[in-house]
A protein has these predicted regions:
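Residues at or immediately preceding the N-termini of alpha-helices
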Residues: 26, 105-106
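Short beta-strand/loop segment at the start of cytosolic alpha/beta domains
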Residues: 1-16
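Residues that form or immediately flank small-molecule/cofactor binding pockets and catalytic motifs
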Residues: 10, 83, 106
Length: 114
């Protein structure tokens, strides 16, 4: 499962996940995802617009890292773009009420900075 990131500045990091967030996908990126999430950046936008499959293992990974970010005073924001399948999964499980979730990139960016 591909993972990439870029830093807007010293406080905001964008992490992009692509592919399947299932057991195999999580095994492939878990350590890197955690390292990128809990770096010195306080705000992290996780881009799931390129994820084509999301199951409980992926949801657990998101929650675990969101908690780690929160423990150091930061916040995770999820961006799904027009990925209706992932958005529906996040809404059905209630994750969108725990981790702010956006379909609009500009709104996600404002939420991360605000």
């Amino acid at each position: 499962m591909p993972i990439s990131f870029d830093d807007t500045d010293e406080t905001l990091r964008h992490i992009r996940l692509t592919g399947r967030l299932d057991m195999t996908g999580i095994d492939a990126i878990s350590e890197t995802f955690t390292e990128l999430s809990v770096a010195t950046h306080r705000q992290v936008i996780v881009d799931l617009s390129g994820v084509n499959f999301l199951v409980s293992f992926g949801i657990r990974e998101l929650i675990t890292n969101a908690k780690l970010i929160q423990q150091r005073g930061g916040r995770m924001i999820i961006f799904v773009g027009d990925n209706k399948a992932v958005l529906k999964t996040l809404e059905t499980t209630g994750i969108d009420t725990l981790i702010p979730t956006f379909v609009n990139a500009a709104q996600a960016g404002r939420a991360a900075l605000g």
